Amino acid sequence: METTHRVVIGDSRDLALTEDSVDLVVTSPPYPMIEMWDDAFGSMNPAASEALADGDGDRAFEAMHAVLDDVWAELQRVLCPGGIACVNVGDATRTVDGRFRVYPNHARVLSAFESLGFDPLPDILWRKPANSAAKFMGSGMVPPSAYVTLEHEYVLVFRNGERRAFEPGATGRYEAAYFWEERNRWFSDVWTDVRGETQSLEGSEARDRSAAFPFAVPYRLINMYSVYGDTVLDPFWGTGTTSLAAMVAGRNSVGVERDPAVVETFEARAERVPDLSRSVVEGRLADHRAFVRETRDRGGSLDYEAEHYDFPVRTKQERGIRLYEAASVERADAGYRVTHRPVEEGRGS
């Protein structure tokens, strides 16, 4: 199996993609009203900078989201019928004109997608501990003017119309099944076992303009909402974590990024994909074998046999599961080509 991974330097408000050409969107946009993104939003919509200069936080918030609205409209155009869009976004806290408040980015993004006709699906909260050891803001130990510290982000999930249709027995779908115990963990509405990613980019400008999320977030979402051979789009590509996860998960990807300096940092990450892929796949197999042992130790039973591995599984739909590892990564036109091979029996044991 081969997958391709393109990176486009451009503006996500005008995607150079045909209609219905991607199967899944996984992205983490710049968050409105987070100070590090003020200049970026101001360059795309001067009304945002003007509102901040006037001390009008509400107007700045809306002007920044107007930029994102144009991107969401493009996603509606390029996402296939029934395709899923996953948007990782956090709320912002900020003092503007002497008044501290929260700016609810997740609610504004939800409203924008609904206005485009997307169906909202249950969302996910994942814990992202703040860098500061202090768990409060404001007046310290004296009530009532301290503020809760935001330590979570949202993964908003939307479907583009009716459920996606598949041919009965589609191989790519059933090989892409996840384990029962993975489903229980991944489809929980609160993720406490992922952590925010520390940036390590070369050059202060590239580092300042990055908003990466941890690998586990896009990797899970890609496995949850796509099948082998699908194409995943990230319109705010940044450090390329979504493409990295797609490479490991056996999906194609397209990334769009405005800053060439950020894109240049990805090659070193791509070179490590075979090792990362091997580690992830072996970890999943080892975790399932541990689940089998624990289930049997408790006197439980697993009633189905996996077709490609020598272990049992809990449900009939898991029987065809087949994990692939990235055997090689090569540079290709405007991106990378990855060759995948199925992981044979005996790995991860």
Descriptions of predicted regions:
Residues 169-180:
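Active-site-adjacent helix-turn-beta-strand microarchitecture at beta-sheet edges
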